[in-house]
Amino acid sequence: MKKILVALMATAMLMAGCAPKTPAASTPAPAASTPAPAASTPAPAATKIGTASIVNVKGANYNTADKKDGTAQSDVTMCTVMLDDAGKITYVNFDVTQSKFAFNDKGELTTDLTKGVISKKELGANYGMAKVSEIKKEWFEQIAAYEQWLIGKTVDEAVAMKTFEKDASHKEVPDVAELKTSVTIDIGGYRNALVKAAANAK
């Protein structure tokens, strides 16, 4: 009897040792991650830059009766403009210098030419327009409002701006709602300088 039990136990152990082992469940390796494509940066718009200046000279002769010096004034309106590839204005800057000269009856200059000329923008509040302006704004504030209005517009759109004649000295004042309370200066000379600067843009 013992021999039979021993034989049965040996057979069971042998069968257990020969039974196929169930392989451990393998964890699949994580799939290689595909990097997300980098966000494409749009190519910058092509830009052209142009500058121009317009000179206007006026004056008065020497007054022989009063022996008053003659005068001459040179007003130079300057414009720098940047245009994108669609022809729209992305940057614009205006400034003006007013050079005044005096001369005597011999035609000799009596003005001190060693003094530099300060532009309207450089003068800032010292230009003194606010005290005589109906909107109480200085020249630099008004030209800044006009410059801002031009951004995003084409030169043709700038030229097409409606204007009105306020008086003999202000024949081209902006007649658009956005500038009614910010610009009362004559923009004719600035508009002409803009057209010239845009034509020079490269």
Model-based region annotation:
Residues 1-16:
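Sec-dependent bacterial lipoprotein signal peptides
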Residues 3, 19, 103-104:
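Alpha-helix boundary/interfacial micro-motifs
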Residues 5-6, 24, 125:
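Intrinsically disordered, low-complexity segments enriched in glycine/proline and serine/threonine
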Residues 16-30:
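Bacterial lipoprotein signal-peptidase II cleavage site
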Residues 26-47:
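Post-signal peptide N-terminal segment of mature Sec-exported envelope proteins
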